[in-house]
């Protein structure tokens, strides 16, 4: 409590810029990079000076540090995660998502869309494994079981998934096809190995 009362808020400015670099292989092509200034001035005048100097100068990359990181696939969809993904990826409101999912379910293309479970049945996992081996290679397969976070979820129920994972595309309307594709991708990727990503830190200065 004493530390909270003694805390004095400090104003500072975060400065970032978008830079374009000339590709080595194709001189005509540029690649945008977002860089953040290490200095965070607490005065507006100083921040404006840095921005002004940065805009009117040529920059030189002085260092690139790269590290490999792994990222695990996300669990198969529950009702809530399907709504969230459809909102961010497709721009669908929750009610629109559920309406489309209802039609896909009625056509026998996906499992029941109201579920808190991330569980996949043994038969579904076998089909998904076959799809991965055939299309991406056996090395990309990693069978996973996801533990449902909801205490009230019934593990006997399955996650929202394609009823026939071998079908990459399904649905009649564009909305149905887009949502089905989203569900298919999430379901199949849930049984794949971790993605290996390269994270790079670029340091640039004004020479």
Tell me what each language-model feature is.
Residues 1-207:
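Core catalytic DNA strand-manipulation module of type IA topoisomerases
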């Amino acid at each position: 409590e004493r530390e909270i009362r003694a805390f004095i808020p400090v104003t500072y400015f975060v400065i970032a810029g978008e830079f374009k670099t000339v590709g080595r292989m194709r001189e005509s092509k540029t690649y945008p990079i977002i860089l953040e200034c290490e200095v965070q001035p607490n005065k507006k005048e100083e921040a404006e000076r840095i921005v002004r100097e940065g805009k009117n100068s040529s920059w030189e990359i002085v260092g690139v540090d790269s590290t490999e990181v792994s990222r695990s696939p996300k669990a198969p969809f529950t009702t809530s995660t399907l709504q969230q993904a459809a909102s961010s990826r497709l721009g669908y409101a929750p009610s629109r998502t559920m309406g489309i999912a209802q039609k896909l379910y009625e056509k026998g293309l996906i499992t029941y869309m109201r579920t808190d479970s991330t569980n996949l049945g043994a038969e579904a996992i076998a089909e998904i494994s076959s799809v991965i081996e055939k299309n991406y290679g056996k090395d990309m397969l990693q069978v996973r079981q996801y533990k449902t976070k909801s205490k009230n979820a019934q593990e006997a129920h399955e996650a929202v998934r394609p009823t026939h994972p071998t079908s990459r595309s399904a649905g009649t309307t564009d909305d149905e096809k887009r949502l089905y594709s989203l569900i298919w991708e999430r379901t199949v990727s849930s049984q794949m190995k971790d993605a290996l990503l390269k994270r790079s830190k670029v340091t640039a200065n004004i020479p």
